[in-house]
Amino acid sequence: MGLVVVGAGGRMGQTLIRTIQSIEGAKLVGAIERSGSPFLGKDAGEVTGIGTLGVAITDDPLPVFAKAHGVLDFTSPAASVEFAGLAAQARIVHVTGTTGCSAEDDEKIRAAARHATIVKSGNMSLGVNLLSVLVQKAAEALGPEDFDIEILEMHHRHKVDAPSGTALLLGEAAARGRDIALADNSVRVRDGYTGPRETGAIGFATLRGGSVIGDHSVILAGTGERVVLSHHAEDRSIFARGAIKAALWAHGKKPGLYSMLDVLGLNT
C-alpha cells in the first residue's frame, strides 16, 4: 500500500517514515511539508536519518495523493481538514491522529468521509483503544452514585492542546458507559472555591512538562476504594504502528468515518 506522510519533518512524521519501512505491505510514496519548510526538496529518508528513500519532500499534496493509496496525518486541525478534503478528491484512505479539532472541524472531516475512507482517533495505539473499552465497562458497572470518575493526563512541554485527544477519547468511553453526553457532564477546570463535586461529572486534570510522550489514568473513586486504569506511552512508534495498521485495514473499505475501535474489532 502506497502511503503519504504529511508533516513529514515533525516528530510524528519522522516516526511514521521510519516505521513504514518495517511493516510488510506498506511503502512510503510521498512526503508533505508546509510551504516554507526547511525540509522541502530533501529526501524523506535522509531527514529521518535512515538513508535515501528516493522520496522528496514537497509542499504540493494533491499530485502526490493522486498516486497513493492512503495518507497518514498527525498535523494540526486546520491542516487535517484540508488533507481530508484532498483525500476525498483523490478517493484514498485518510488516517488522522490529529487532536484539538473543533466541532466545525469534525463536521468538515465527516463531510469528506462521503468520498474518502477516513480513520480518525485521538490515539492510534492498540493499548489505549483497548483501555477505552475497559473504561466503558468499568463506568457502566460502577455507577455515579458510588464512584466518581477523574481523568489525569500528562504530556511533554510542547503539546499545544488540552485536555489531550486521548483523555477526551477516554472521557467519551466513560460517558458511554454511564449513558450520558460528555459535553454536558465534564469538568475541565477547577480553580478557587468550587463547592462540592457534582454527582456524575467526569473530571479532567492536565499536566505538561519535560519529554513525557503520554501518560493517562482513569480513576474511579469510591468510598474506601479506588480503581485506576492506566496507559503509559514509552515510544511514539506505538502511534505510528497503529496508524499504519489502520491504513492497511481501511484500504479497500467503502468511504466513511471509522475509528480505531473499528480497526481492532472492538466497536460494540
From Swiss-Prot:
Localization in the cell: Cytoplasm
GO biological process: diaminopimelate biosynthetic process; lysine biosynthetic process via diaminopimelate
Binding positions (NADP(+)): R34
Positions bound to NAD(+): G7, A8, G9, G10, R11, M12, E33, G97, T98, T99, S121, G122, N123, M124
A cellular component term, taken from the record's GO annotations: cytosol
Keywords noted in UniProt: Amino-acid biosynthesis, Cytoplasm, Diaminopimelate biosynthesis, Lysine biosynthesis, NAD, NADP, Oxidoreductase
Catalytic reactions on record: (S)-2,3,4,5-tetrahydrodipicolinate + NAD(+) + H2O = (2S,4S)-4-hydroxy-2,3,4,5-tetrahydrodipicolinate + NADH + H(+); (S)-2,3,4,5-tetrahydrodipicolinate + NADP(+) + H2O = (2S,4S)-4-hydroxy-2,3,4,5-tetrahydrodipicolinate + NADPH + H(+)
EC numbers for this chain: 1.17.1.8
Database matches in InterPro entries: DapB_C, DapB_N, DapB_N_CS, DHDPR_bac, NAD(P)-bd_dom_sf
Role: Catalyzes the conversion of 4-hydroxy-tetrahydrodipicolinate (HTPA) to tetrahydrodipicolinate.
Protein name: 4-hydroxy-tetrahydrodipicolinate reductase
Gene: dapB
